[in-house]
Amino acid sequence: MKPFRFLTLPSCLATMLATGAHAQSPEINFLGAGKQIVWYQDIALTEVQQSQFDKISKDIDYFGGFALNTENGAWGYTTGFFSQDLAEQAAVKICEGNARGRPCRLVAAVLPATVAPGTRNAFGFSKYKEKYYKSEFLPEVKRQKSGRYAAFAIGSRALGYDTNAKSADVAKLKARRNCEKAEAWNRKKSEISVRNAISAMDGQKCRVIEVIGPS
């Protein structure tokens, strides 16, 4: 087994993938190319606000949100999140920070096109993560000797895994820890407003979405 390499991602509930070798296996919703914009408020944006919104609408593989204070024109946006809920909540918190504590309203969200309209996605799985999951994680699982457990975890903006544990609990613990290392690295690279917004929520914590037991 090669040493574990935790993965950092750019400035992002999966459903169940059922195969016979999987002990606890939420189905993973692989999100394809394209995007959709969900408008929550019928508000005309200024030219500057529109240019900022255009930035998040270009990120087609991940989730983003845009919030606005209509009194003073302050705004906040997020992009590159694995989670629709976290992207929207963080956008509101960033906006309220820019608005000096005044309330902000969520104006819009940007979602991958494959997300069904009207559904909520606590975690999404982009094409990038699908490729990593299939080309790195699963092949490494197959190379392990019998009797070993593997786990795969994702957070708001990172992922991690372990494939050589003696029990399911140990595999989950290692996967979460590796994911959290990547989360911490990404938070250091983020703007202070984004770090504060994520830290104020539960979004920086990684969740195990896949556990594979001995076949």
Predicted regions and their residues:
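Bacterial N-terminal signal peptides that target proteins for export
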Residues: 1-9
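Bacterial N-terminal signal peptides
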Residues: 8-16
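Sec/Tat signal peptide C-region and signal peptidase I cleavage site
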Residues: 19-23
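Secreted/extracellular ectodomain signature
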Residues: 24-215
